[in-house]
Each structure stands twice: as C-alpha cells, then as structure tokens.
C-alpha cells in the first residue's frame, strides 16, 4: 500500500532462560547500556519443526523462519508512520497450542496491520514444547 511503519525487533523482556534459568519462570531482562540494535527478528524458541507434510509452501510457511534458540524471550513493536496520537495497541500472541510457533512468521506480517489499521502491534516470543 506504500504506507510506512517503524519497527523494533528483538527487544528483550526477560533474561535468556539458559543454564539454571532453563526451567524457571522468566526473570526480568537486565538493563543494557548504549543503543540496542533492534533491527532484526529475534530467535524462535526451541521446538520440533514439522516435516510431516513435506517441503511445500503451504506447510513450510508455519515453520520457524529465524534460528531456534533457548535465548528467545523478546518482543517486537511495529508503529504506523506518521505516529498516531491515540492509537490502539494490539498485543499479538501467536497460536500453536504451546507446541510450536513464532511471532516472526511471514504470515504474521505486523507491518500490514500497523499500516492499514493504524494500530501499534506488539508481539512476543514465548517458550513452547518441552521448554515452555
């Protein structure tokens, strides 16, 4: 549509759930110093990638499109440009039955929602499957 958005991807909301934090509740993210590089989509949380239906677009479009990692607790924010004064904020929590999924799938293109519906879209990665 030619409409513009601003996007911040991969903002940590919790400490990486590694080592002794693996099976614990998420701990608040530690402060960072300087400027956070929020220009690339975050890792997808560890999960079993579905290969039952083969390698065709209708099936693979639901498979993670970013690297799988236990370091995956991040949010993404997409805002229409120019920035609206009183926009609604939509929190997008992807489905997947706590078994699989990721907020970064191309079918969940937040830019379209933000630009066409004039809403601020926030999405998050969360642990799924055996680590969820």
UniProtKB/Swiss-Prot annotation:
Effect of residue 114 to T: In strain: TemR and Trans
Reactions the enzyme catalyzes: acetylcholine + H2O = choline + acetate + H(+)
Coiled-coil residue windows: none
Gene Ontology terms for molecular function: acetylcholinesterase activity
Protein name: Acetylcholinesterase
Biological source species: Culex quinquefasciatus
Keyword Disulfide bond among record annotations: yes
One Pfam family in the UniProt entry: COesterase
Keywords assigned: Cell membrane, Disulfide bond, Glycoprotein, Hydrolase, Membrane, Neurotransmitter degradation, Secreted, Serine esterase, Synapse
SUPFAM superfamilies listed in its UniProt record: alpha/beta-Hydrolases (SSF53474)
This protein's record includes keyword Secreted: yes
């Amino acid at each position: 549509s030619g409409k513009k958005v601003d996007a911040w991807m991969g903002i940590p909301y919790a400490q990486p759930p590694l080592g002794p934090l693996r099976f614990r509740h998420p701990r608040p993210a530690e402060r960072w110093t300087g400027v956070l590089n929020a220009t690339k989509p975050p890792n997808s949380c560890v999960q079993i990638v579905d290969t039952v239906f083969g390698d065709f677009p209708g099936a693979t479009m639901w498979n993670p499109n970013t690297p799988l990692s236990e370091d995956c607790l991040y949010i993404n924010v997409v805002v229409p440009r120019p920035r609206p004064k009183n926009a609604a904020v939509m929190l997008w929590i992807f489905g997947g039955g706590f078994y699989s999924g990721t907020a970064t799938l191309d079918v969940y293109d937040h830019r379209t929602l933000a630009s066409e519906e004039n809403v601020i879209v926030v999405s998050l990665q969360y642990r799924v499957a055996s680590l969820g």
